[in-house]
């Protein structure tokens, strides 16, 4: 493995370990960012199941024209995952940025999720 991959893996593990310590039974809002799309899911680690998910690949996103890996798509994904989580009765989550900097698309997704009813 390259030094950069090892560094990124260590950062991801460090962030997730810190989250598990402070979660107190709350589900986590996990973000994955690729060069073409953005994905988010609300995961209950105690049960090991996904409660809600959304991505820029979904048909509703394509119809609205919010596809791809830009800030507008991240905002739409954040809003959609928050609405789905609130429908399932989840209002409190822990934000798992997954080793990504809290900036740009990750920040836009988090802000949109907060505006749509999730608190973290």
Curated annotation (Swiss-Prot):
Family label: Belongs to the universal ribosomal protein uL18 family.
Asked if the keyword rRNA-binding belongs to this entry, the reply reads: yes
Write the protein's name. Large ribosomal subunit protein uL18
Q: Which gene encodes it?
A: rplR
Quote one Gene Ontology molecular function term.
Answer: 5S rRNA binding
Q: Which GO terms describe its biological process?
A: translation
Q: Which InterPro entries match?
A: Ribosomal_uL18_bac-type (IPR004389), Ribosomal_uL18_bac/euk (IPR005484)
Q: Which UniProt keywords apply?
A: Ribonucleoprotein, Ribosomal protein, RNA-binding, rRNA-binding
**What does the subunit section of this Swiss-Prot or TrEMBL entry state?**
Part of the 50S ribosomal subunit; part of the 5S rRNA/L5/L18/L25 subcomplex. Contacts the 5S and 23S rRNAs.
- CDD domains registered for this protein in UniProt: Ribosomal_L18_L5e (cd00432)
Q: What does this protein do?
A: This is one of the proteins that bind and probably mediate the attachment of the 5S RNA into the large ribosomal subunit, where it forms part of the central protuberance.
Q: Does the keyword Ribosomal protein apply?
A: yes
Q: What is the lineage of its organism?
A: Bacteria, Pseudomonadati, Pseudomonadota, Alphaproteobacteria, Hyphomicrobiales
Give the matching Pfam families.
Ribosomal_L18p (PF00861)
Gene3D superfamilies assigned to the protein according to its UniProt record, in alphabetical order: 3.30.420.100
């Amino acid at each position: 493995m390259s030094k950069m991959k090892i560094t990124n893996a260590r950062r991801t593990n460090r962030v997730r370990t810190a989250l598990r310590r402070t979660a107190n039974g709350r589900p986590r809002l996990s973000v994955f960012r690729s060069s073409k799309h953005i994905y988010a899911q609300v995961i209950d680690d105690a049960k090991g199941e996904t409660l809600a998910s959304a991505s820029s690949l979904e048909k509703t996103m394509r119809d609205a024209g919010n596809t791809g890996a830009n800030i507008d798509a991240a905002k739409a994904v954040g809003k959609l995952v928050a609405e789905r989580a609130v429908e399932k009765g989840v209002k409190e989550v822990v934000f798992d940025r997954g080793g990504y900097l809290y900036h740009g698309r990750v920040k836009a997704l988090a802000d949109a999720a907060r505006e749509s009813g999730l608190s973290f």
